[in-house]
Amino acid sequence: MAPPAKRARGLTLPGYKYLGPGNSLDQGEPTNPSDAAAKEHDEAYDKYIKSGKNPYFYFSAADEKFIKETEHAKDYGGKIGHYFFRAKRAFAPKLSETDSPTTSQQPEVRRSPRKHPGSKPPGKRPAPRHIFINLAKKKAKGTSNTNSNSMSENVEQHNPINAGTELSATGNESGGGGGGGGGRGAGGVGVSTGSFNNQTEFQYLGEGLVRITAHASRLIHLNMPEHETYKRIHVLNSESGVAGQMVQDDAHTQMVTPWSLIDANAWGVWFNPADWQLISNNMTEINLVSFEQEIFNVVLKTITESATSPPTKIYNNDLTASLMVALDTNNTLPYTPAAPRSETLGFYPWLPTKPTQYRYYLSCTRNLNPPTYTGQSQQITDSIQTGLHSDIMFYTIENAVPIHLLRTGDEFSTGIYHFDTKPLKLTHSWQTNRSLGLPPKLLTEPTTEGDQHPGTLPAANTRKGYHQTINNSYTEATAIRPAQVGYNTPYMNFEYSNGGPFLTPIVPTADTQYNDDEPNGAIRFTMGYQHGQLTTSSQELERYTFNPQSKCGRAPKQQFNQQAPLNLENTNNGTLLPSDPIGGKPNMHFMNTLNTYGPLTALNNTAPVFPNGQIWDKELDTDLKPRLHVTAPFVCKNNPPGQLFVKIAPNLTDDFNADSPQQPRIITYSNFWWKGTLTFTAKMRSSNMWNPIQQHTTTAENIGNYIPTNIGGIKMFPEYSQLIPRKLY
């Protein structure tokens, strides 16, 4: 029998199976992402040829897709292919869109988990006519640029982009490009375009992988700042400062700026409860991919008041006022995530929202003289001064970040940021040290049905194996395990620093059956109308306590150190219980201060908290990095997405005094639209167990939590994020 014919290798580059001309389409699995893109490109060319088209002499949609997929390639083959097809795009004629072989074979995209999987998504509405006119004009003038920069490269971008070129009401073009990490679009009064989209798309990629594309849009209201200056403000204690109340300490120094921060770094900005149900019930792992945001449809108005009594307010469009926009692509300014203060953009897409005022901590010297525990009634002596001159770091946005000036109808785009983070598990672990490894061999098994009839074990001194107690008693309590799941953490401990005392953070874990929240790092959330409180309520702020699902918590009140029958030394030469004093100080016990963290400690990551939790965080610039952050499950290995700042430019009057720090201003405010896209990849869960599992669902009793009241009131409830169990060992 003749040997099988060899597969045509063509002129592929060394180390690749598909990157190069002339190869066959059955070379096996691609060697890297660039090779995978080349395989898809070859398959598209094959379809062109079978349909009677010649893709080699025309620039096609497949070529454009290959360019996008290799835009950030680091391998040499991907770079060569990327620039080859960019050159082809510049010189070769183009195939029409109807010639694309991929128009009828798109992957399945589910727009929203709220729709039945079998329902047909609504068709796209045709774009307005003026968009095609604008694109044609932009193409003719050669101003169509793309921007897909990675702010994690820590290199400031100075290439301007046009987020969109628009026509003014008179038909003349106006506006211009911007610089820095983003760009401003050519604007024009009367022709403002954009889209309002809060859908979540689930694209199933095969082999258990899903791409989640979350869209968010908000109408943002921005008032002019109360002042145009930077202010260094000392904050002193507003609460009592007597002994035993140091948890009330508030003293610090902050720099208050005239700028506002647009922060979308919270789960509730991107997902609704139905989205989160689909993710938590079906995904076992998730990771961040990319993030981009845009400001568009800027409207600036001025307010004047009549001299009548009562005065009448008159609102006018101001076509010359400016909205200042700054994107800190290099993370030059202090990083101030707003989720821990519940000041991100609001969670309800149909409600207008507002950005928070940008401010940051400044170095200060905190002198503290608390009384001893024997002088409980003495007053704490404290004071605060400006920090050491060697520690002062005063930043202004005006000289640290490029600023773009937008007028009515203009828009601004940040470009695409690509994350570098570790995947996050959406499952919880139930195994503790008592559940790792092989259980002890039973002496007898029950013969009568019912849990009240247990099995029995051999005597503790007759069991075989090894443990770490130097006696012959081998019990489940003394059995050796491969590692330590969780650890005993000192809790409610306040360390002192130059800035004052602070509560030492604790890795959040699930409670034990004794419900010891504080020893296990439970997080307390407080929120207002925009972030979960009942929107029609005037009562106190909404609050809840969040405990993760993974079972690695401790119950310090139930722990003990025991001597007999073990050879252990302890304080009282006997049993040391939580009630025993240390150093003569009551209400302190050994387990409160014991830290068992070590090289054998095994930990789970910080759990995501929907809707109020922070999503990503900036890595601390220290030589020794923490393994986890308490505030967010994703920690960016390089710089995080740049912070986005906005401010209404000073709208001055003719009454100007250069010797005065504050000038008379025309009262100006702005409404503009913000939208963003946050992309994830996720792994779908597989069913390997016999028993069904607990899942997030609604009941007849709790469905009212997710729908408005008769007068429009609605609130957001925290949702579990790690319901699916997993084994550790």
UniProtKB/Swiss-Prot annotation:
VP3 might be a post-translational cleavage product of VP2 in several autonomous parvoviruses. GO terms for molecular function: metal ion binding; structural molecule activity. One of its GO terms (biological process) is microtubule-dependent intracellular transport of viral material towards nucleus. The N-terminus of VP1 is sequestered within the mature capsid. It contains a phospholipase A2-like region and putative nuclear localization signals. This is Capsid protein VP1. Keywords: Capsid protein, Clathrin-mediated endocytosis of virus by host, Cytoplasmic inwards viral transport, Host nucleus, Host-virus interaction, Magnesium, Metal-binding, Microtubular inwards viral transport, T=1 icosahedral capsid protein, Viral attachment to host cell, Viral penetration into host cytoplasm, Viral penetration into host nucleus, Viral penetration via permeabilization of host membrane, Virion, Virus endocytosis by host, Virus entry into host cell. Its main location: virion. Residues 1-37, 94-129, 163-186, 437-465 are annotated as: Disordered. Belongs to the parvoviridae capsid protein family. Residues 24-34, 98-107 have a biased composition (Polar residues). InterPro entries: Capsid/spike_ssDNA_virus (IPR016184), Parvovirus_coat (IPR001403), Phospholipase_A2-like (IPR013607), VP1/VP2 (IPR036952). The keyword Nucleotide-binding does not apply. Signal peptide: none annotated. Residues 112-128 have a biased composition (Basic residues). GO terms for cellular component: host cell; host cell nucleus; T=1 icosahedral viral capsid. Residues 173-186 have a biased composition (Gly residues). Mg(2+) binds at residue 330. It is found in: Virion; Host nucleus.
